[in-house]
Amino acid sequence: MFLIVGLGNPGKEYEHTRHNVGFDIIDVISEKYNIDLNKKKFKGMYGDGTIANEKVILLKPLTYMNLSGESIKEVTDFYKIPKENVIVIYDDISLEVGRMRIREKGSAGGHNGIKNIIAHFGSDVFPRIKVGVGQPVQRDLVSHVLGKFNKDDREILSKVFEAASDAAENIIEKGTAEAMNKFNGFKA
């Protein structure tokens, strides 16, 4: 069994912001694999289905980004999902828009949502799909990540969201190393 988590913040004011690309990609995966996120439990919205012949849970934590680990840990404890089978999808300001990077493990890199997940797991060994949202230009970091994308970036991101969905399936089917080889050079 796998858990695919998209990080984001709940609430209308955060919809389609840079910080919520994880939620947006979960929506793409949900639609592609016909998995409804219609259950509210574990401090999140979730649904279950099948991807690549594996049982999968999709999760959007509703704890706000910086406490995402609480929701994820509740799901992994309840379903006995090993952290190596938890795929976390989130925004990365160090990558330009149109890029994504897959990692098997690693530090939080300044991302408070990831920092909280590492704290709850007691480990940084879990696969992640980092989606580029670009560096802030003449504005502070908070305004940047809570800001929305312009029209051109949204068009690029629709391709990235599809690729991230394919990458999650590839991780499930063939493993993180294979997905890294296939997708880490991706540019939309």
UniProtKB/Swiss-Prot annotation:
Keyword set includes Thylakoid: no
Binding site for tRNA: 14, 64, 66, 112
Gene3D superfamilies: Peptidyl-tRNA hydrolase (3.40.50.1470)
EC number annotated for this UniProt entry: 3.1.1.29
Pfam families xrefs: Pept_tRNA_hydro
Keywords linked to the UniProt accession: Cytoplasm, Hydrolase, RNA-binding, tRNA-binding
Enzyme class: hydrolase
Molecular functions per Gene Ontology: peptidyl-tRNA hydrolase activity; tRNA binding
Catalytic reaction list: an N-acyl-L-alpha-aminoacyl-tRNA + H2O = an N-acyl-L-amino acid + a tRNA + H(+)
Claim: RNA-binding is one of the keywords in the record: yes
Site feature location: Stabilizes the basic form of H active site to accept a proton: 91
Active-site residues (renumbered): 19
UniProt superkingdom: Bacteria
An annotated GO cellular component: cytoplasm
GO biological process: protein quality control for misfolded or incompletely synthesized proteins; rescue of stalled ribosome
Subcellular location: Cytoplasm
Site (Discriminates between blocked and unblocked aminoacyl-tRNA): 9
Subunit structure and binding partners: Monomer.
Similarity remark: Belongs to the PTH family.
Function description: Hydrolyzes ribosome-free peptidyl-tRNAs (with 1 or more amino acids incorporated), which drop off the ribosome during protein synthesis, or as a result of ribosome stalling.
The protein, known as: Peptidyl-tRNA hydrolase
